[in-house]
A protein has these predicted regions:
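Beta-strand-loop-alpha-helix segment that lines the small-molecule cofactor/substrate pocket
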Residues: 90-91, 95-143, 157
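Nucleotide donor/acceptor-binding cores
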Residues: 17-19, 133, 163
Length: 435
């Protein structure tokens, strides 16, 4: 996406204009977004769509008396009063709704993970460019002031040359959510619309209304859900577009008494030029709290960061020969310890607390870019590259082998079977929307 976008294909917002927002999807994060945008001083919430009528009514009530409710998001996109949309649907709808919104002349704030499969990301970026639309991806950590501070420090060499990054999310949801039987959809739910481009399946309470993340038809599991937040910061700080290789292992190893499919345990190793990154998630063990956020390891120490803040842990300057173990002296010719030296840190220690509401700041950045036509802080191209990285890990896990990736050509090298996983078919009639 270019730095500044033309506004020729849609109604431009002047510097003092209000922005008319429509919401598509009113689940957990959709509720949060209505709250955040409603509290912005220059927003009019004019519409909300959800294919589950009770949620649609609840969302419209939260939006206010001026908001219209739509059970079909396409009617919201037809509404000329809607200038921009916030997409908070399950993952399998993100790309198609975003592309159709761009075609309708709407700017888009779309939740992460941006895509369900790799090729969707390029389709979305192409739509943004073709229709001159602003797309903000919901990787809100970029809008945290302490994340921006940490990025600046690391870019300026505060912890030295970064060679390793660890990323993680650990929690314990044992014994899981059970195995409800297939049944009829709840009253007021258009299940066929909820499925949209996804395969036709019998309704199950776990296939919708939050639990969709445990099924490959609609999500990449916690690798794409939580992993995208942390990988996004890694890409942003390190200035990379993707790994050269990804390998992953894990599975549904602990939550075996429910009907979920995606891994409760997963490790993924990403090989980038000059450094490696390791993602780990656990759904059945929090342990000592080691599984959270990111830690960047450099030659002067490490920087650990979460949404609560960050801390620099400096290494101590110790002569290398003093780090060789000795047992009652060293044999002749071996390293000799330096007897007279003063240990000192390679870099100053630092601890910074969170200082702003990053979700509200992310909404604010999107609105400012709708008006200015500038590229937002979390643009579509970056969202595509991050989601691709997570998808590569899942392809590796499901095929049981390392995936070699060329970020420049966006192709998997030397593996036709893995390459076939870069795209999934859309169910009719939604498959015709992109033709």
């Amino acid at each position: 996406m270019p730095t500044t976008l033309s506004s020729s294909s849609g109604r431009a917002a002047g510097a003092n204009d209000r922005v008319q927002i429509g919401f598509i999807g009113f689940g957990l994060i959709g509720h949060q977004h209505v709250h955040d945008f409603k509290n912005q001083p220059d927003v009019d919430i004019v519409a909300l769509s959800d294919c589950y009528e009770p949620r649609m009514r609840q969302g419209v009530a939260m939006c206010g008396p001026q908001a219209k409710g739509y059970s079909d998001f396409r009617r919201l996109l037809d509404d000329k009063n809607v200038q921009a949309v916030v997409v908070s649907t399950p993952d399998h709808w993100h790309a198609l709704i975003t592309i159709l919104a761009c075609q309708a002349g709407k700017d888009v704030y779309v939740e992460k993970p941006m895509t369900l499969f790799v090729r969707e990301g390029r389709w979305m970026a192409n739509a943004a460019n073709r229709y001159h639309r602003v797309i903000q991806v919901g990787t809100q950590q970029r809008s945290g002031i302490h994340y921006q501070h940490a990025k600046k420090l690391m870019r300026n060499g505060y912890i030295g040359h970064i060679h390793t990054v660890r990323l993680a999310s650990f929690r314990n949801i044992m014994p899981g959510f059970g195995r409800p039987a297939d049944c009829a959809p709840p009253p007021g739910m258009n299940y066929d619309m909820w499925l949209g481009p996804a395969p036709k399946r019998p309704y199950n309470p776990h296939r919708s209304l939050y639990h969709f993340r445990w099924f490959w038809d609609y999500s990449g599991g916690q690798m794409t859900n939580l992993g995208d937040h942390e990988l996004d910061i890694l890409h942003w700080v390190m200035g990379v577009e993707g790994p050269g290789a990804a390998s992953s292992d894990g599975g549904r190893l602990a939550l075996t008494d429910d009907n979920g499919e995606t891994p409760d345990t997963q490790d993924a190793l990403f090989e980038y030029p000059g450094f490696t990154a390791l993602w780990s998630h656990r759904e059945a063990s929090r342990g000592r709290g080691a599984g959270a956020g990111l830690e960047f390891f450099g030659t002067k120490g490490s920087l650990f960061i979460t949404r609560s803040g960050f801390q620099v842990f400096p290494d101590t300057k110790i002569p290398p020969q003093n780090q060789v173990p000795q047992f009652s002296g060293m044999p002749v010719g071996g390293p000799t310890h330096v007897a007279d030296f003063t240990p000192e840190p390679w870099t100053p220690a630092m601890k910074i607390e969170r200082s702003n509401d990053l979700l509200a700041a992310h909404a604010r950045n999107f609105l400012d870019c709708v008006k200015s036509r500038r590229e937002p802080i979390a643009p579509v191209e970056g969202g595509h590259r991050v989601a691709t990285t997570s998808h590569l890990a899942n392809i590796s896990l499901r095929l049981g082998r390392k995936i070699k990736w060329n970020p420049a050509t966006e192709t998997i090298e030397g593996d036709p079977e893995a390459s076939s996983w870069l795209e999934r078919p859309y169910r009719a009639p939604w498959d015709r929307e992109l033709r």
